Amino acid sequence: MPHVLVIGGGNAALCAALMAAEAGAQVTLLESAPMQWRGGNSTHTRNLRCMHDAPQDVLVDAYPEEEYWQDLLKVTGGITNEHLARLTIRASSTCRDWMRHHGVRFQPPLSGALHVARTNAFFMGGGKALVNAYYRSAQR
């Protein structure tokens, strides 16, 4: 069995640790922050932007790959690796199920928030709840 050491306890580190464990690795995660501060900047997030071709449970309307790509070009000023960006955009369409499997809950779309409810899925309880769900899942 491989051993994996993950340094940090934010969203990316927790996802890496959980995925390594799912792949059969023995995982050690090191987080220097005390429990009430763990998670780094991830505790300040509130949502996930994800591609979807049709309305879904917590996402209204559609947010197709090409529109997501065009939005990414706007915010990066066109300085981005298209291959990696599109790979990430496509993968975003399936990550909510994986997140739910690890205890993340999403809130239903809010009325009057159509512009963001179309592109973003909001975490119930925000980033702190996201991080805590991943820690609970990792401790199982």
Regions found by a protein language model. Give the residues of each.
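Conserved N-terminal/central alpha/beta ligand/cofactor-binding core
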Residues: S32-R140
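Beta1/beta-strand and adjacent pyrophosphate-binding region of the FAD-binding site
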Residues: M1-A12, T28
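Catalytic-loop motifs flanking and including active-site residues across diverse enzymes
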Residues: A12-A13, L130
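Aromatic pocket-lining residues of Rossmann-like dinucleotide-binding sites
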Residues: A20
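Generic hydrophobic/aromatic pocket-lining and core-packing "Φ" positions
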Residues: A16-A17, R96
